[in-house]
Amino acid sequence: MIPNHILILGSPNSGKLRVSKLISNDKDFPEIKENESHSGIIIKTSLSTKYYHIKLNILIDEYPEERNKSVTDEEKLLELEKWFNEFKSEEFGELREVLDGLVFTVNMKADSLEFIEKALETVSEIRTSLGDEESQWDGFISIIGSTTQGESVDDDTVEEIEDLVITHGFEFINLNTQGINEFKEKQGKDRVVELIESHEWTNMELLKVNPDQYEKNKMNKVEQMKQNLLEEKESMDLDVVFSKLSVAKERAEDMTQEQKEKYANEIIEEIIDFI
């Protein structure tokens, strides 16, 4: 089977390895020395759901090139721009063609808001480089924020980072969280897993679904929805539904038409699950 590819890009201590371990379920992970650069690491793994099976190559890259060197925000941005100039060159054309997703990691404690905002401009350029004149790129881009172990970041900073990310048309995931939020959306580590599992990969081996079981599951869900609508339940909070729609509309403002359609379908499914 032909493998799929995703790229995880970030500066040192921004969570690249934690994200890759989460995606690979900590399987097939190479031994990495503490002070060794993460650039060029490739994790060859596989992923199976009840619907499909895929082979997946997780490509990790890092900037700056010297891991132990103390650098300013300006120097990091220059290194990121240098990385992008190489990535968009003809030499890396084959890599761009096979990518199904890009994860850009930031350290919510160490990276300033000014740095993150300018870095997101480069990520926008990366997104543009992944398409061509004939067709749009069908992959996903996610900005994942975290802190080094033992450190915390205040809620206001997290909200400001999320606002910056959404303004640039990307999804933000706070790796320090998990479970579901007040809108019944998966967040943090659970959202990373959901993002990977729900993506329509280029190369998939679809698994056969038992028609009887599929019909049974569908009817069970219809019956559950009917009961929820008929019963007067406190959990049936329309304000939450309207809030979810409002947030979704705001997030979708800067997306492309194709991204909006995909995002809208996801929101519709979540609302159906909620009611």
UniProtKB/Swiss-Prot annotation:
Transmembrane stretches, start-end: none
Domain of life of the native organism: Eukaryota
Gene Ontology MF terms: protein-macromolecule adaptor activity
UniProt keyword annotations, A-Z: Chromosomal rearrangement
InterPro entries for this protein: Irc6
GO biological process: vesicle-mediated transport
UniProt entry tagged with the keyword rRNA-binding: no
Pfam families xref list: Adaptin_binding
Function noted in UniProt: Involved in gross chromosomal rearrangements (GCRs) and telomere healing.
PANTHER family recorded: INCREASED RECOMBINATION CENTERS PROTEIN 6
Family: Belongs to the IRC6 family.
UniProt protein name: Increased recombination centers protein 6
Organism encoding this protein: Candida tropicalis (strain ATCC MYA-3404 / T1)
Species classification: Eukaryota, Fungi, Dikarya, Ascomycota, Saccharomycotina
